[in-house]
Regions:
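Alpha-helix initiation and N-capping motif
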Residues: 10-11, 20-24, 125, 151, ...
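Divalent metal-dependent catalytic cores for phosphoryl transfer on phosphate-bearing substrates
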Residues: 57-174
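Acidic/His-rich, divalent-metal-binding segments that scaffold phosphate/diphosphate chemistry
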Residues: 1-97, 122, 138
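Extended, charge-rich intrinsically disordered regulatory tails
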Residues: 165-169, 174, 178-186, 192
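Residues that form generic nucleotide/phosphate-binding pockets
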Residues: 1-5, 13-17, 131, 157, ...
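Generic low-complexity, intrinsically disordered sequence content enriched
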Residues: 17, 49, 176, 190-191
């Protein structure tokens, strides 16, 4: 998906992370969560790719979306998790993960790289950071901001859809087909 991003500053920003072999190795080995969804080795990569694919699809339906901004935000939305969670087999919250969380940590990481790119447009930087800050959608879900631009809303919807469907997939994988599994507090529903 990096090659789809044509805006030169966003493209360079993506390469500053995903062109770094050590970062990519770490990113590919991390989970997306301790236990909620994609809580396995490679879960962060799988979740990120799924969210990015959903966002790319949204762009075909809603042409007013800035595709370069949304795809970049999708690829970066959980980037802070490489520092929020420790490596396997521990896969537990780090001190910074407990104190700051992946959203704040991700925005800090992105901001640090943006400062190294000459002429990075300030409005574009703010819009990208906003997408990351708002990707959980609601304050009660840990989002410091609610989505204020269409790209942030689309990212929130894609992230939520993939996380919830993965929860369902994981629950259904261990169930007898056609049988009720029982109440899932994250879905707030009985699942079949």
């Amino acid at each position: 998906f990096i090659q789809k991003v044509k805006e030169p500053h966003l493209h360079e920003l993506l390469l500053s992370f995903f062109g770094d072999k050590e970062f990519v190795k770490n990113f590919c080995q991390h989970s997306a969560a301790k236990s909620v969804h994609h809580g396995f080795i490679g879960g962060l990569l799988e979740h990120t790719l799924s969210v990015t694919k959903i966002c790319d699809f949204f762009c075909t339906l809603y042409p007013m979306i800035n595709r370069d901004l949304l795809l970049t935000a999708a690829m970066f939305h959980d980037i802070g998790k490489v520092n929020e969670l420790s490596d396997f087999p521990e896969n537990d919250y780090t001190d910074d993960g407990q104190l700051l969380g992946h959203i704040v940590m991700g925005v800090e990481m992105i901001g640090s790289h943006i400062r190294e790119i000459p002429g990075f447009p300030p409005v574009l930087a703010s819009e990208l950071k906003h997408c990351i800050l708002a990707h959980h959608g609601e304050f009660e879900y840990g989002s410091p901001k609610k989505p204020a631009i269409i790209e942030a809303a689309a990212l929130n919807f894609a992230d939520n859809a993939d996380a919830k469907l993965e929860i369902m997939k994981e629950q259904l994988a261990s169930a007898t087909p056609g049988e009720w599994i029982g109440f899932n507090r994250l879905m707030d529903s009985n699942i079949k």
